[in-house]
Amino acid sequence: QMLSIKAGRKIYERLETLCGARITPQSVSALSDEAIRSTGTSNAKVSYIRTITDAVLSGSLCFDELRELSDEPVIKKLTALRGIGTWTAKMYLIFVLDRQDILPFEDGAFLQSYRWLYNTTDTTPASVKKKCAKWKPYSSIAARYLYRILDLGLTKEDFHLFK
């Protein structure tokens, strides 16, 4: 389920308030499911939050250790947790670990800017990977520019890279 940035921020702010201004595995663990749901989080997401919180508290997931791993092992470790998919793992690699060569071809926002940039409707994974191969080893940096283009509203204007 995709959330708008505004809705996501609101949920985060509510959770932050419930956790006493600091969201930690311990503070989240102390909350009831009902309290977490009251932030606007679905039952399924409450379950996923519990899974991640339990993994951190048990030591089976250590975010500091993820920094030391290459990209694929990070994706594998994160997606092994119920509720975390490839999209989430890639966003973590790009925006938290600042990895330079992650291509988020599954992301709707990325694909919206990609369609605008290349004036195409073909957003199949094979096509996107082929066209973006020239971005290596800086795919994440290019993706960040495409996200910024979307944030600025530029995709609402006509543009074609090869005019």
Residue ranges and their predicted role:
Residues M2-L3, L15, I52-V56, V96, ...:
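Generic structural signal for hydrophobic core residues of well-folded globular domains
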Residues T86-K163:
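C-terminal accessory module of base-excision DNA glycosylases/AP lyases that mediates lesion recognition
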Residues L3-R82, K134:
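Alpha-helical ds-nucleic-acid-binding substructure associated with the helix-hairpin-helix region
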